[in-house]
Amino acid sequence: EKLTELGNSGKPFNLNMLTVDTHFEDGHPCDKCQNRYSEQYANVIACSARQVESFLEWCKQQAWYDNTTILITGDHPTMDSDFLLNIDEDYDRRVFTAYINSARTYNGEKRQYSSFDTFPTLLASIGADIEGNKLGLGVNLYSSSSTFTEEMGVEGINDKLIAKSEFMENLSSQTSEDGSDE
């Protein structure tokens, strides 16, 4: 209902939706899940995929669809270790990310990226021009600018993220005028 209202408003809009049925170990089966596979988690993944597909098919039937960018992304690969027992440990597991109806054309070049790059890439995908193609720690993936992942690798980024910052340490040790921690 909210999406229909926003889509019919004639104004630019943003709507965020979250699915979490696949987020927990073994997943959370809903009343729409079918029992096709021997593992509950596989059934929950299949169920979630069917619901996302159904949602996208519904979107395609709406008047606003052709002028709407849809981003589907995860926040991390599965953490269900039991489900991964039969997956080759060398398999390169990644977070699923898809930009649908982007105003920009992807050139097909394989990129190394992280969630930092979502912000500028999403804005570019709706037609925004980004000076320098960088926002925050992210890079517009439709540009030729290098991402931090491409420049430093995942380990390099992780090393930088866990590094101590004297500035932040000082901020976290500040107390209020009454002597209590803020």
Where are these regions (language model features)?
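Solvent-exposed soluble domains appended to multi-pass membrane proteins
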Residues: E1-E182
